[in-house]
Amino acid sequence: MKLFDVYPLYNINIVKGKGCKVWDENGTEYLDLYGGHAVISIGHAHPHYVEMISNQVANLGFYSNSVINKLQQQVAERLGKISGYEDYSLFLINSGAEANENALKLASFHNGRTKVVSFSKAFHGRTSLAVEATNNPSIIAPINNNGHVVYLPLNDVEAMKQELSRGDICAVIIEGIQGVGGIKIPTTEDRKSTRLNSSHNA
């Protein structure tokens, strides 16, 4: 069996990482500006995380959310304090795509609507609704092309106001910094305009 062809592969075999550096099989050192799709924000092989993860896996690698897990409760408590959202609930999942999928689903449960605003060149994942919110027709299968999403130009505040005024928007999904889109940053005005959805129950 071969690996599924997800991306064009660079001819490099990374075998080790430490801090912000990685090494290939030939021992060539690289400064890691990629970070595994920008998800390795803590760097590689940090001794604290290596110790904590090793200890946890040695005791219990995984169990169900249907039993008490004190470690999960500690994470929720600490994250609440750090973020300032102590009155929120933490839903632990495996990936950004799952996070986006469930956020959109919860929004739809809340207001009963089905239309989502996303932005040109956005990337939100490869699962069902997350991929539909991703502005890339080449990875949206016919089964995912359900007309739930309208794509607006990033930083077009007037387009956002007009779309929200229709009254049928379930949610607005936006990246803090677009990665796939070319490191584009929403302006302060654009980010503020997404808060207009609150007045439209979205």
Model-derived regions: residue spans:
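Active-site core of PLP-dependent enzymes with the aminotransferase class I/II
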Residues: 162, 177-195
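Active-site-adjacent loop/helix segments that line or gate small-molecule/cofactor pockets in enzymes
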Residues: 1-21, 56, 78
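Short beta-strands and strand-loop turn motifs
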Residues: 31-34, 171-178
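Short, acidic, Ser/Thr-enriched surface-loop or helix-capping motifs
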Residues: 24-25
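Single conserved hydrophobic/aromatic residue that forms the stacking wall/gate
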Residues: 196-202
